[in-house]
């Protein structure tokens, strides 16, 4: 299949002109940040609600991701509780990814971190979502036991210009892309699976937490 062109955005892109994004014809889907982290505490991305509504109204396939820095069970529970509240009533056509890159996560062993990520991903699946793991190549190589996460598609960031050899469902290939309707540089990815079709066939994407 021809890779899907996927954009990911958060509060840092400000108010986006979604009509201009759609008219550009350069984007097949959008990953929205649902939760960020401030001083180790999860908080809802202030642009998530608006962007989700705008993409849904325009028929733009949408997925999401949340930033994790949980190193304890209590922190994982707090993140998932905040995520549940933010996702209530939402429907997605792309995966919901766990963003695993925070330096604090390196305090865990690769195996322990993978176990924590797998537990969170399993929770996403109980909510009827297509669970995915996001990280970057060096983190995957040194801090995360990827062999324990093969049940979940990988969204891999690698900006060296060549598609990574590590198996992945999406490749984030730049952080300096440009898309009409958005001020400043943005992250761009290529999805190598037809996630809207996969979610549709499996009946996934309508949050049921």
Task: Kindly label every feature range from the protein language model.
Residues 1-28, 32-121, 125-130:
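Substrate-binding cleft of extracellular glycoside hydrolase catalytic domains
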Residues 66, 135, 158:
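Short beta-strand/turn micro-motifs composed of small residues
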Residues 37, 103, 138-139, 161-162, ...:
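Short, solvent-exposed loop/turn segments at secondary-structure junctions
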Residues 39, 71, 140, 163, ...:
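Flexible, glycine-rich phosphate/dinucleotide-binding loops
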């Amino acid at each position: 299949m021809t890779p899907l062109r996927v954009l990911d955005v958060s509060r840092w892109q400000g108010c986006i002109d979604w009509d201009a994004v759609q008219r550009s014809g350069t984007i097949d889907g959008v990953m929205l940040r649902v939760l960020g982290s401030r001083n180790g505490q999860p908080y809802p991305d202030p642009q998530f609600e608006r962007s989700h509504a705008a993409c849904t109204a325009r028929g733009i396939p949408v997925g999401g991701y949340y930033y994790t820095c949980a190193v304890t069970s209590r922190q994982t529970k707090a993140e998932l509780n905040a995520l549940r509240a933010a996702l209530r009533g939402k429907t997605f056509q792309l995966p919901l990814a766990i963003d695993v890159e925070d330096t604090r996560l390196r305090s865990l062993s690769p195996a322990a971190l993978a176990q924590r990520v797998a537990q969170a991903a399993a929770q996403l699946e109980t909510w009827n979502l297509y669970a995915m793991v996001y990280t970057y190549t060096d983190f995957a190589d040194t801090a995360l036991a990827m062999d324990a996460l093969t049940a979940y598609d990988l969204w891999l960031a690698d900006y060296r210009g060549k598609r990574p050899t590590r198996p992945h469902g999406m490749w984030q290939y730049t952080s300096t892309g440009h898309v009409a309707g958005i001020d400043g540089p943005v992250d761009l990815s290529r999805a190598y699976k037809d996630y809207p079709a996969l979610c549709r066939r499996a009946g996934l994407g309508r949050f049921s937490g």
